[in-house]
């Protein structure tokens, strides 16, 4: 029983302790709930009081005035709101408008604000309430002293009047103002915790930052002013430009002629290859034009609207670089379109020429070529490639009237100019042609077009060719045609022999023309032909018949033109060297009157290939696309070829001018070349001239062709009978050097005689034959001392 009593008494004790814990746990919750309810109740009351104050009307009945009880109330708070607003305004003046805010702050502090700080200090809420009361008293007194001291309800109200009156009577106006101001500042500090020293420090920082801020604002204002002025200037310029655009004449757009190429009479005849007409066996007939492919229909270039738009774009792009210019004309062509630009006074051509790449980038085209001078016009040309490029066929050019009207058998069909008109040239007037460009620029196709132009214009009786093809690919296809002097040359040593023969033939023709009394090959052929037609042929003055052998005098015959094609001039220069350059220079200097002409082609336009000696004697040049302005200047002595488009696009420098013409070369397919070659092979047998490629060449009058191509007597000095042979032998055996130039220099004789002396020593076994590098070994021992 004793054990059961404590158990019974312990249960009530445990229940009491648990109830206390529950009450303690519920107490903060209840306090928070009551605070929230109190704030919810106070908030509408403060809003009601604030609305009553702001809608106060002096006509409403109140504490200080009586009115009509049945009159409408203007105050939003009704009659009670009008009474409360009148009481507050009369008591506190303008500070009454802040009273709801102060009451709200007091409610917040009392209910929520300082519950966390009560554990640290019990004076916090009390000091804040004291500060708010002090703020109310000091603010009303300050307003009454400083603003208005008239009616009771003005400024600080009754409270302000009492405070200001009591202070003024004791301390005077100055003392009252100072006291009220100090009380106001202290009250604000107590109510809010604001530190006036912190306020002054912050104000000082603001004042110090005011200087840089003003500088920035001043700078921004200056920039804004400048921007505004520039904007106004641009607007003014736009207005002026708009007026100019409205007044300016439209761009002159000259469309290409409808029939760009007029067919010749020969083209009308050669519409197809004759099937039943016999082919001439002597090769005198020209190949029909039907062997060539007909041109295909081409797409049009830029429309007039596009040309007008491009003209405006060019003007705007130049204006971006501060260049005033106006597009006055547009001339569309098969490959490019030329825009004529009239620059403003004071604008240099070099300023526009230096912007070619920038203009090309702005117009989104591959390249732009600037033409500095257009003959007969005061404008600058700007050549822009077309979007769709027209393919030019050789058959168009050979069927044109320009090609057919040319009476020269050396007429070359080069292509079309920028307007689409055929461009033909006379090789006899050039009289030599240099063709240069990078690989893939259309150089070999252009050479084939030139060859076919000559083959369609002249028979093998009027024209003979010597073709040198170091690459063994381009010109070898013409092997076996009756126009060739010798087989197509692929060995460069034979090429040197062929050039030596041409030099000797040039000298022989000069002697014939001198004997006949004419100045060029055309006059010589005319005189010989007239004599043959008259039945009194002229005898060869250089042929000396041998009566012992029964030889009769040989009559003269007309001489054909000779055209020498060298497809890759650089390879031949590398293999043969200076010797070939001298032969080519000699032909270029003198061969025009003799009817011998050169067409040199190279894909390496460098100064070691196109030397000054060659450029001085070959003024007519064709430049295809090159990689740099330096290469263009090497070929044409001016830039421009670096801006070409490739695929036959060329700059043609005619003889006697310094301004190149832009020409778009004609395309010739391999099938067309093979058809023409097969037709020429069937028209006549090949008739090579003997000895053209031989190492030792003898002319018809018995003279031997020397190393320089000049004829030398076969029985002249230079062998063992030469009086200088022994002296030359002594020099060679003593110096142990078998050099032609050394013998020539020591004996002070000509090159040909020194060469014959060395050859005589080789025949006598004194020196060895020349090795692959041209050196000889002295085999004989030195003379005894």
Curated annotation (Swiss-Prot):
Instruction: Give me the disulphide-bonded residues.
Output: none
Main subcellular location: membrane
Q: How does it sit in the membrane?
A: Multi-pass membrane protein
Matches recorded under InterPro entries: AAA+_ATPase, FtsK/SpoIIIE/SftA, FtsK_4TM, FtsK_alpha, FtsK_dom, Ftsk_gamma, P-loop_NTPase, WH-like_DNA-bd_sf
Q: Where is the composition biased (Basic and acidic residues)?
A: 1-14
The UniProt annotation places ATP binding at 440-445
Give residue spans on the Cytoplasmic membrane side. 200-785
- Supply the PROSITE patterns for this chain: FTSK (PS50901)
Sorted alphabetically, the Gene Ontology BP terms of this entry are: cell division; chromosome segregation
Family assignment from sequence similarity: Belongs to the FtsK/SpoIIIE/SftA family.
Function, as annotated, reads: Essential cell division protein that coordinates cell division and chromosome segregation. The N-terminus is involved in assembly of the cell-division machinery. The C-terminus functions as a DNA motor that moves dsDNA in an ATP-dependent manner towards the dif recombination site, which is located within the replication terminus region. Translocation stops specifically at Xer-dif sites, where FtsK interacts with the Xer recombinase, allowing activation of chromosome unlinking by recombination. FtsK orienting polar sequences (KOPS) guide the direction of DNA translocation.
Describe, as the record does, how this protein assembles with itself and its partners: Homohexamer. Forms a ring that surrounds DNA.
Supply the name of the protein: DNA translocase FtsK
UniProt source species? Xanthomonas axonopodis pv. citri (strain 306)
Q: What gene codes for this chain? A: ftsK
């Amino acid at each position: 029983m004793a054990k059961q009593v404590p158990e019974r008494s312990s249960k009530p004790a445990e229940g009491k302790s648990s109830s206390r814990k529950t009450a303690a746990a519920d107490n903060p919750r209840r306090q928070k709930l009551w605070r929230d309810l109190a704030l919810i109740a106070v908030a509408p009351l403060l809003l009601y009081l604030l609305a009553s104050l702001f809608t106060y009307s002096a006509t409403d009945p109140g504490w200080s005035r009586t009115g009509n009880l049945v009159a409408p109330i203007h105050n939003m708070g009704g009659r009670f709101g009008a009474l409360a607003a009148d009481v507050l305004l009369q008591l506190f003046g303008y500070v009454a408008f802040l009273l709801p805010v102060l009451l709200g702050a007091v409610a917040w502090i009392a209910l929520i604000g300082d519950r966390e700080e009560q554990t640290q200090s019990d004076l916090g809420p009390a000091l804040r309430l004291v500060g708010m009361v002090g703020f109310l008293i000091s603010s009303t007194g300050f307003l009454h002293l400083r603003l208005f001291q008239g009616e009771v309800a003005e400024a600080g109200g009754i409270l302000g009047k009492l405070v200001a009156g009591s202070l003024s009577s004791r301390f005077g106006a100055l003392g009252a103002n100072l006291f009220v101001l100090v009380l106001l500042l202290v009250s604000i500090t107590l109510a809010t915790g604001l530190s006036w020293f912190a306020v002054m420090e912050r104000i000082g920082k603001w004042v110090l930052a005011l200087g840089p801020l003003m500088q920035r604002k001043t700078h921004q204002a200056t920039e804004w002013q400048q921007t505004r002025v520039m904007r106004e200037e641009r607007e003014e310029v736009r207005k002026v430009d708009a007026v100019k655009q409205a007044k300016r004449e439209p761009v002159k757009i000259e469309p290409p002629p409808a029939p760009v190429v007029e067919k010749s009479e020969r083209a009308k005849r050669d519409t197809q290859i004759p099937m039943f007409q016999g082919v001439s066996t002597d090769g005198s007939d020209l190949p029909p034009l039907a062997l060539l492919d007909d041109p295909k229909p081409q797409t049009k270039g830029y429309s007039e609207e596009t040309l007008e738009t491009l003209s405006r774009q060019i003007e705007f792009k130049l204006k971006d670089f501060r260049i005033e210019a106006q597009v006055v004309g547009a001339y569309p062509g098969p490959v490019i379109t030329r825009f004529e630009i009239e620059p403003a006074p004071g604008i240099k051509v070099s300023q526009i020429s230096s912007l070619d790449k920038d203009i090309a980038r702005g117009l989104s085209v591959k390249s732009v070529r600037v033409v500095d001078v257009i003959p007969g016009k005061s404008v600058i040309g700007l050549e822009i490639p077309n979007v769709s490029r027209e393919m030019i066929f050789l058959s168009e050019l050979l069927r044109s009237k320009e090609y057919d009207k040319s009476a020269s058998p050396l007429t070359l069909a080069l292509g079309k100019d920028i307007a689409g008109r055929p461009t033909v040239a006379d090789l006899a007037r050039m009289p030599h042609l240099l063709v240069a460009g990078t690989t893939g620029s259309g150089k070999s196709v252009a050479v084939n077009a030139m060859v076919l132009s000559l083959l369609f214009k002249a028979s093998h009786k009027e024209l003979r060719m010597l073709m040198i093809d170091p690459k063994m690919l381009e010109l070898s296809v013409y092997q076996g045609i009756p126009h060739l002097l010798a087989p197509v040359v692929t060995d460069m040593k034979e090429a040197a022999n062929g050039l030596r023969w041409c030099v000797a033939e040039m000298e022989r023709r000069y002697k014939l023309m001198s004997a006949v009394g004419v100045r060029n090959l055309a006059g010589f052929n005319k005189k010989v032909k007239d004599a043959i037609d008259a039945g009194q042929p002229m005898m060869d003055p250089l042929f000396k018949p041998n009566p012992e052998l029964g030889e009769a005098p040989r009559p003269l015959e007309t001489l054909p033109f000779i055209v020498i094609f060298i497809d890759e001039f650089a390879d031949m220069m590398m293999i043969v060297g200076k010797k070939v350059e001298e032969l080519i220079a000699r032909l270029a200097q003198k061969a025009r009157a003799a009817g011998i002409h050169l067409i040199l082609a190279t894909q390496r336009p460098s100064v070691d290939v196109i030397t000054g000696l060659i450029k001085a004697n070959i003024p007519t040049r064709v430049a295809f696309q090159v990689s740099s302005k330096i290469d263009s200047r090497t070929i044409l002595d001016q830039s421009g070829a670096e801006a070409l488009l490739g695929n036959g696009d060329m700059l043609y420098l005619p003889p006697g001018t310094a301004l190149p013409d832009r020409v778009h070369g004609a395309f010739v397919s391999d099938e067309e070349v093979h058809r023409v070659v097969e037709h020429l092979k069937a028209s006549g047998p090949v008739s090579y001239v003997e000895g053209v490629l031989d190492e030792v060449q003898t002319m018809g009058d018995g003279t031997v062709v020397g190393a320089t191509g000049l004829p030398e007597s076969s029985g002249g000095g230079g062998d063992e009978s030469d009086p200088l042979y022994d002296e030359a032998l002594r020099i060679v055996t003593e110096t142990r050097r078998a050099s032609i130039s050394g013998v020539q220099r020591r004996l002070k004789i000509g090159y040909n005689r020194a060469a014959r002396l060395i050859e005589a020593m080789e025949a006598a076994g004194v020196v060895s034959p020349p090795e692959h590098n041209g050196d000889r070994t002295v085999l004989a021992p030195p003379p005894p001392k």
